[in-house]
Amino acid sequence: MTAHKIVMLVLDGIGDRPCGELAGMTPLQAAKTPILDQLAAEGITGIMDTIGPGIRPGSDTSHLSLLGYPPESYYTGRGPLEAEGCGIHMEHGMIGFRANFATQNDHGLVTDRRAGRIHDTRLLSAAITDQVDLSAFGVTFSFASGAGHRAALALSGEGLGAGVTSNDPKEDGVAPHQVMPVSANPEDQKTAAVCNEFIRQSTAILADHPMNRARVLNGESPASVVLIRGAGEMGGFEPFQQRYDLSGAVIAAATLVTGIGKAVGLEYIPVEGVTGSTTTNLTGKVQTLMATLDTHDFVLLNIKGADEAGHDGHAIEKRDFIERIDAALALLLERNDCIIAVMGDHSTPCPIKEHSADPVPVLIRGDGVRVDLVQAYDEIACAAGGLNRIRGADILWILLDLIDKTHKYGT
């Protein structure tokens, strides 16, 4: 047996449903994918429910499941994981939130929840960090930019709770909501008040920021309000290396995925030019993967763009991006010391523009892997594969067994 390392390649949102503009095929079926098809033909395939049949997975719960951390035990909300991914060191008990920079008009209505898909908000985040003062509540905070319009907020202090609503109206043309406690608990009441004060102060800071004044002069949407959601209290995770006896790394543009990786103890490996969209640096990601395998036993590589195209309902763009992914994966064929597993984390069908419970295709290729009769990697072909239908909670244990890292159950 020569394989002693694991590549977990997650094609985010790869699964789909029949699309009219693709003659009833899914984008993955319609795409020309000689590399993925070769990996499928040289390995074993199947389909996978990352949480369970009929359950629509979030990107957060699905990645926890794929890494062997049952979300029913470990998931406390998306916010703290996003905050970790944005570079905020989240300690046990801190309250984390996802955040968006958005555009609010003079009437107080949100007109663009992504602030014109603004690219770099670090100056805005720095101003908020320097000028917002929550000391009257006995609370400190961290606020950090993510990719594009995304950001994260973390609160620290005594007597805080995660039981609060969002100010995000979830649609344009509506004013931001007040953050409300979801219970009568004093901790939730306090956190709601802190959040509303943070939003009030940050909105005033953004209104007068030179970067926003310049955007208005250039005809661009200003980032004039922060929308927060996904509150959660940071939990504890058994370190990945201690849990599985493997040194691990994560390569991803999505701050959620890097946050999950860092939370469980994977080393975050940055890559220049990654965007989390269909414009990302695919070649750089795969080259970085190859280099990281020289120093780590396990690498999680997440490629996000297909998910974005699915949410936008752009089946042809999704197909074309899948073909670009496939071309970039040619380097993987050179590695014989690895078990290569390719999978989705969930389906994002273009017809519904949202996550669905449709199972995702999975393939495993490497030394010692049984080879089935499947010759293509897509949702339909893989359903006939030798893995049959598995759960996300199963996949890492299957991979660990293939590199002889599991133990006999019983005698």
Curated annotation (Swiss-Prot):
Q: Which GO terms describe its biological process?
A: glycolytic process
According to the UniProt entry, its GO molecular function terms are: metal ion binding; phosphoglycerate mutase activity
Tell me where on the tree of life, at the top rank, the source sits. Answer: Archaea
What enzyme class is recorded for this protein?
Answer: isomerase
Question: What Pfam families does its record include?
Answer: Metalloenzyme, PhosphMutase
User: In which pathway is this protein known to take part?
Assistant: Carbohydrate degradation; glycolysis; pyruvate from D-glyceraldehyde 3-phosphate: step 3/5
Which reaction equations make up its catalytic activity?
Answer: (2R)-2-phosphoglycerate = (2R)-3-phosphoglycerate
* Annotated EC: 5.4.2.12
Its keywords, alphabetically, are: Glycolysis, Isomerase
User: Family, per the entry?
Assistant: Belongs to the BPG-independent phosphoglycerate mutase family. A-PGAM subfamily.
Question: What is the role of this chain?
Answer: Catalyzes the interconversion of 2-phosphoglycerate and 3-phosphoglycerate.
Q: What is this protein called?
A: 2,3-bisphosphoglycerate-independent phosphoglycerate mutase
Organism this protein belongs to: Methanosphaerula palustris (strain ATCC BAA-1556 / DSM 19958 / E1-9c)
State the gene name recorded for this protein: apgM
